[in-house]
Curated annotation (Swiss-Prot):
Record-linked SUPFAM superfamilies: SRP19
Keywords noted in UniProt: Cytoplasm, Ribonucleoprotein, RNA-binding, Signal recognition particle
GO biological process, one term: SRP-dependent cotranslational protein targeting to membrane
UniProt protein name: Signal recognition particle 19 kDa protein
GO MF annotation list: 7S RNA binding
Pfam families, per database record: SRP19
The protein's role, per its UniProt record: Involved in targeting and insertion of nascent membrane proteins into the cytoplasmic membrane. Binds directly to 7S RNA and mediates binding of the 54 kDa subunit of the SRP.
Gene that this sequence comes from: srp19
Protein family according to the UniProt entry: Belongs to the SRP19 family.
HAMAP family with a match to the protein in the record: SRP19
Annotated organism of origin: Pyrobaculum calidifontis (strain DSM 21063 / JCM 11548 / VA1)
GO cellular component, one term: signal recognition particle
Amino acid sequence: MKKRGGRILWLVYLDSTIPKSRGRIIAKGVAVPKPTIQEVEEALRRLGYSYESYPEKKYPPLWFEERARGYFLVKSDEKPASIAAKVAEEIRRIRGQ
């Protein structure tokens, strides 16, 4: 999703424990289990993206689940799936997987 000159990256997009039918946008093998706001923020920083963080917001289709909390507005023209795959890969490096 594009918003105010950037791309929205919900934590749900990266979460391997959430099925694609509920919001994940990258392959399960690429996604990471239960990413945190801090991990995604660190990954975006390491990858050199400019971003804004909205940790209190909930992914509308999963408003009732705590793990669906938080999104980032990434200043980029790349597709969200491309950004999500890079961030997931960086989170794997951070976790040492």
